[in-house]
UniProtKB/Swiss-Prot annotation:
Homotetramer in solution and crystals formed by 2 dimers. Only elutes as a homotetramer in size exclusion chromatography, interacts with KaiC1 and KaiC3. The KaiABC complex composition changes during the circadian cycle to control KaiC phosphorylation. Complexes KaiC(6), KaiA(2-4):KaiC(6), KaiB(6):KaiC(6) and KaiC(6):KaiB(6):KaiA(12) are among the most important forms, many form cooperatively. Undergoes a major conformational rearrangment; in the free state forms homotetramers as a dimer of dimers. When bound to the CI domain of KaiC switches to a monomeric thioredoxin-fold (KaiB(fs)). The lineage of its organism: Bacteria, Bacillati, Cyanobacteriota, Cyanophyceae, Synechococcales. Belongs to the KaiB family. This is Circadian clock oscillator protein KaiB1. InterPro entries: Circ_KaiB, KaiB-like, KaiB_domain, Thioredoxin-like_sf. It comes from Synechocystis sp. (strain ATCC 27184 / PCC 6803 / Kazusa).
Length: 105
């Protein structure tokens, strides 16, 4: 692995401290700790407390997970319990596979 790993910047938009919000955050933290130890920054945004941020980022439903960096911006809306779908949906799994293939050559 390259010593210069990229950092993933993610935003999780939730609506208060509801069971769905708590579950989404727990599942996401689990995925990130397993797959991206130390190479991610996660900001949790409560759209009830910060509706202007949700409006600026065009968030229509919660929970919504947005990958901000590296580009392109990708979003997943709803259930975050399927690890593989989250990684593929955000292009995170694809990036890791591509990097491993490049290292093997």
């Amino acid at each position: 692995m390259s010593p210069f790993k990229k950092t993933y910047v993610l935003k999780l938009y939730v609506a208060g401290n509801t069971p769905n919000s708590v579950r989404a955050l727990k599942m996401l933290k689990n995925i990130l700790e397993q797959e991206f130890q130390g190479v991610y920054a996660l900001k949790v945004i409560d759209v009830l407390k910060n509706p202007q941020l949700a409006e600026e980022d065009k968030i229509l439903a919660t929970p919504t997970l947005a990958k901000i960096l590296p580009p392109p911006v990708r979003k997943i809306i709803g259930d975050l319990s399927d690890r593989e779908k989250v990684l593929i949906g955000l292009d995170l799994l694809y990036d890791e596979i591509r990097e491993r293939e490049a290292e093997d050559q």
